[in-house]
């Protein structure tokens, strides 16, 4: 009998709750700071009221609204876990590799998991429209689809570099009915100020956040947060909750849980439901490894301090690993990894040594993406590729120890709309 490669969870077994890590953190999360006295009031105006309430929730588990659960099923949940057998063989059969395939959702990434919740709660507030930022376009396309499914209008502010480098995601958002604007944007006062200084400003996620918040505030919309904050991570934990059930189905318990970090929600969404069990037990056995871009090394070279999550400094300061809210990253193709900070909950766990952080260059990660594509037949997103080098390191560690290890990977998205970016780096086209 052939080895089981794909682990599916029946639709009627989809988890009915999100997981909230706040009650299980090793210490209380440092609260937001508001030096101006205006940022928290702004948040109350631009965030959906239920999202703001859930940001500070004390409950360990939060019921997923039926309307959101129904749409999870509609967009491809539960997603499968796939065993990367040929990659295992290439690495010497020292590790077993299981991929949580968030790329199987209709938008091709993990982002739809929280987009549906945010837009649903904005609709409950009778918002005129929603706004958000996007880098490579995965988050923007997810908000665009979520808005379509809840019959809402969406304005997406896309980092200018990606707006022109990744036109197909822009078209995807437009197909879902969203309006897409390059950021810095001439629709906002902050954007116009930046464009006056540099009409070809490449933009950044921090700037796009500022554009989206300002536009929502001045025009009666609600701002949809794409990462970093606890509520967004909570909404995305549907992936980790599914993965726990799937690993139990095959009698496997991961020794390592790995994934990439832009703002932190992708990795946290998979890892937190597993990590929460260990934090409550008082002993963390597994190794949790988060990877990022060496071109934007916030986890390895950043400082753990209070900083603004957006460039215009409109939002409250958060304690996180950061390389500075004014940082304008190089135009690397993994647009989702270009954010300057790391989610406060994940930052706390990194600072305590519970989660390890590693960075890899674009060139190294893209070479692994090509190898992975040849071996497994599936092309990862540029962001996702930054998790692949970890596997070789784990395989080498397992070889030295003589113990075969099991690795669970967040396969956060596919790269079928990023082939031009791969070609520029790998084939010099």
UniProtKB/Swiss-Prot annotation:
State the Gene3D superfamilies in the record: 3.40.50.1100
Q: Return the broad EC class.
A: lyase
The yes or no answer to whether the keyword Acetylation is present is no
Q: Which InterPro entries match?
A: Trp_synth_b-like, Trp_synth_b_CS, Trp_synth_beta, Trp_synth_beta/beta-like, TrpB-like_PALP, TrpB-like_PALP_sf
Which terms in the Gene Ontology molecular function aspect does this entry carry? L-serine hydro-lyase (adding indole, L-tryptophan-forming) activity; pyridoxal phosphate binding; tryptophan synthase activity
Which pathway is this protein engaged in? Amino-acid biosynthesis; L-tryptophan biosynthesis; L-tryptophan from chorismate: step 5/5
Q: What is its EC number?
A: 4.2.1.20
Cofactor(s) the record lists: pyridoxal 5'-phosphate
Key words, A-Z: Amino-acid biosynthesis, Aromatic amino acid biosynthesis, Lyase, Pyridoxal phosphate, Tryptophan biosynthesis
Question: What GO biological process terms are annotated to this protein in UniProt?
Answer: L-tryptophan biosynthetic process
Residue list for modification N6-(pyridoxal phosphate)lysine = 111
Zinc in keyword set: no
Domain of life, per lineage: Archaea
Spell out the reaction equation it catalyses.
(1S,2R)-1-C-(indol-3-yl)glycerol 3-phosphate + L-serine = D-glyceraldehyde 3-phosphate + L-tryptophan + H2O
Q: What is known about its subunit structure?
A: Tetramer of two alpha and two beta chains.
Which family is this protein grouped under? Belongs to the TrpB family.
NCBIfam families for the chain: PRK12391.1, trpB_rel
Role played: The beta subunit is responsible for the synthesis of L-tryptophan from indole and L-serine.
Protein name as annotated:
Tryptophan synthase beta chain 2
Q: What is the lineage of its organism?
A: Archaea, Thermoproteota, Thermoprotei, Sulfolobales, Sulfolobaceae
